[in-house]
Curated annotation (Swiss-Prot):
Assembly behavior: Monomer.
Tissue localization of expression: Expressed by the venom gland.
Residues annotated as signal peptide: 1-20
More about this protein: The disintegrin domain belongs to the long disintegrin subfamily.
GO cellular component, one term: extracellular region
Family per record: Belongs to the venom metalloproteinase (M12B) family. P-II subfamily. P-IIb sub-subfamily.
Organism annotation: Gloydius halys
This protein's name: Zinc metalloproteinase-disintegrin agkistin
CDD domains cross-referenced by the UniProt entry: ZnMc_adamalysin_II_like (cd04269)
């Protein structure tokens, strides 16, 4: 285990509270001004990083002390991450920027098991955290020669028009069975499929309308997308899905697929472009288009359902909002949920929050959690139709993890046997959440060839053949499902 770097931040509350201010997050009606003062850090490793792997902040909210623990989101980018834009004559320009020492963090509030946080530390602190069921935002005021930040509740951000924002989901069938209750699901007794980690290698495309919306500032667009994906990855952690950004495209010379007022037509054209062009030069599982287009009928996002591993249909489109990154991230999480086969929530679905990610209408309140219905349907689908998500089992190379492992962040890193999250959240009996080691007597914690914490017998089919392919079999000595040596 690594020694966690502690950085204490003393936040002195300004003698008055602001009544109204315009921030990147919008027009805020009520806020506190605070001044982060960084106490000298503990000795660092010989190799210096601009952004620490782990930090701790202390401040007060409503007069009560809060301790915020942050850990760098080391799984944010894939090893082969690339960025592509286009010259004025349409020539493709691809770069591979260094992204290991980035400034995007996840975290928690000490002594609050239900807390979450997503923070950018690139230029001051910017992001949100959940404390005792309420969402707060922190953002730099960007005053000359000042470290002043604003802390405010989401309810104090002026909302846009109250018209219901709708999600559009394209079905490939006319009807489907309703979501079953948890008691009706036929889960394996050991739950090994439930605990199996899955990986979505994601490409995000900023269309030409978004490029012009931000005055051609590719750096700003990239930063916006990093922040969105940092929130998105946190949304999917409880589902044991790791989302890694593997590519970013900016259509700087013009639209490369049709973008119209019709969300259906725009989605269809984007899917055709992905199959025809993007897949031929960039390996990935899913592509999402971030667009500056305002679609008709109050559509905020559109996606195909149960399409995650389909060549054309593993796509979604999401409307960009300049000031509301968390809002865009939650819509994208919603559309990817449809790609995974998850339906809209019914009125009876709950998620211990004011709104859930898969609500049919988009709430102004941040929706950071999937409902019980969404989780149950997802688990049911991967048990009864595992081939529909076959592309999500190829783990990204661990060489992209360049900093020491952090136990409890859900990511299996070098030196760990398993990682099922913080002890309060871990539900895997094969994994000791406090040490990220296997529990006594366990041979494995997850994997297609792991059953009841033990390796499955040699010769057990772990991956059924598709088409002219061959079945894959467990070897009896590992939890993974090795490729059949007879594969051509």
């Amino acid at each position: 285990m690594i020694q966690v770097l502690l950085v204490t931040i003393c936040l002195a509350v300004f003698p008055y509270q602001g009544s109204s201010i315009i921030l990147e997050s919008g027009n805020v009606n009520d806020y506190e001004v605070v001044y982060p003062q960084k106490v000298p850090a503990l000795p660092k490793r010989a190799v210096q990083q601009k952004y620490e792997d782990a930090m701790q902040y202390e401040f007060k909210v409503n007069g009560e002390p809060v301790v915020l623990h942050l850990e760098k989101n080391k799984g944010l980018f894939s090893e082969d991450y690339s960025e592509t834009h286009y010259s004025p004559d349409g020539r493709e320009i691809t770069t591979y920027p260094p992204v290991e020492d980035h400034c995007y963090y996840h975290g928690r509030i000490e002594n609050d098991a239900d807390s979450t946080t997503s923070i950018s530390a690139c230029n001051g602190l910017k992001g949100h955290f959940k404390l005792q069921g309420e969402t707060y935002f922190i953002e730099s005021l960007k005053l000359p020669d000042s470290e002043a930040h604003a802390v405010f509740k989401y309810e104090n951000v002026e909302k846009e028009d109250g018209a219901p924002k709708m999600c559009g989901v394209t079905q490939n069938w006319e009807s489907y069975e309703p979501v079953k209750k948890a008691s009706q699901l036929n889960f394996p007794p050991d739950g090994r499929i439930e605990f199996l980690q899955r990986y979505i290698e994601l490409v995000i495309v900023a269309d030409h309308r978004m490029y012009t919306k931000y005055d051609g500032d590719k750096t700003e667009i990239s930063s916006i997308i990093y922040e969105i994906v940092n929130i998105l990855t946190q949304n999917y952690r409880p589902m044991h899905i790791r989302v890694a950004l593997t590519g970013l495209e900016i259509w700087s010379s013009g639209e490369l697929s049709n973008v119209t007022l019709s969300a259906d037509d725009t989605l269809d054209s984007f899917g055709e472009w992905r199959e025809r062009d993007l897949l031929n030069r960039k390996r990935h599982d899913n592509a999402q288009s971030l667009t500056g287009m305002i679609f008709s009928e109050n559509i905020e996002g559109r996606a195909y359902k149960e399409s995650m591993c389909d060549l054309k249909r593993s796509v979604g489109i999401v409307r960009d909002y300049r000031t509301r990154r968390h809002f865009v991230a939650n819509i994208m999480a919603h559309e990817m949920g449809h790609n995974l086969g998850i339906d809209h929530d019914r009125d009876s679905c709950t998620c211990d929050a004011s709104s859930c990610i898969m609500s049919a209408t988009v709430s102004n309140e941040p929706s950071s959690r999937f409902s019980d219905c969404s989780l149950n349907q997802y688990l049911s689908d991967i048990i009864h139709n595992p081939l529909a998500s076959y592309c999500l089992y190829n783990e990204p190379s661990k060489t992209d993890i360049v900093s020491p492992p952090v136990c409890g962040n859900y990511y299996l890193e070098v030196g760990e046997d398993c990682d099922c999250g913080p002890p309060a959240n871990c539900q895997n009996p094969c994994c000791d959440a406090a040490t990220c080691r296997l529990t006594p007597g366990s041979q494995c914690a997850e994997g297609l060839c792991c059953e009841q914490c033990s390796f499955m017998k040699e010769g057990t089919v772990c991956r059924i053949a598709r088409g002219d392919d061959l079945d894959d079999y467990c070897n009896g000595i590992s939890a993974g499902c090795p490729r059949n040596p007879s594969h051509a």
